[in-house]
Amino acid sequence: MGHRDKRHSPPELHPPPPSSSLADAGEVARERFPGEHRRGLLPEQYFRWRGGEITRLEAFCDVVFGFALTLLVVSLEVPRNYGEMMAAMRGFLPFAVCFAQLVMIWLAHYRFSRRFGLEDPYTVFLNIVLLFLVLFYVYPLKFVFTLVFSQLTGGDIGHGLGWHEAAVLMRIYAIGFTAVFSLFALMYAHAYKLRDALELNAVEALQTRLAIQENVIMGVVGAVSFALSYVSPGLAGWWYFVLGPTLGIHGAVTGKKVRLLAEKLKLA
């Protein structure tokens, strides 16, 4: 009775052995977090998501994005005759474009939150500024695209709009566009500074740097559009079409770099 029964002793916990290489670190991460990077909406193959349960900050952000979408449709009414029905249909395309832009911003915010799960004061501050911009620019965003599609479809919105007014509208849109993606660049730059605390492996650190580049590209395009609005409001609007090929080339080149590094470190 004076000795302890070793059969009922709790098992000893041993920390994982130190890794001697990046490849070993990748193997340890995959063993400790099986399938972690494949959970949730739009999972990623080479990035382990560090965001756990939905936090109060994420929930608040989702509510604000939902409210912004509500503001897009708050002025819509049920058509009472054929003429009102056709007028409502003309508003479908600008609504769809605005909806797509807000969803794109929400997805970018969702991915950042899932990747890093940061809630330090600086990240919270950037999130609050982002939400302010999203809410503030809902009506300018809707007006700009309603005006554009009205001009393309022969509507009466925008008749009498002068060169100066059109230029001011494009500047307002450019300021919002540039500010939103500059905030995302700052958020990713902050996460990159914390890469050691977040235990980012080489592939995740590379993807974080590439996300900074992508958001800087978006911000630069918006800034150039702002400058072009002083020359030609129309040219300032068409300038945004350079985003397609620019981001396509950037994604193809950087995606190959990520795959090659992942294969080198045996993370695939």
What are these regions, as identified by a protein language model?
Residues G2-A268:
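Multi-pass alpha-helical transmembrane bundle typical of ion/small-solute transporters
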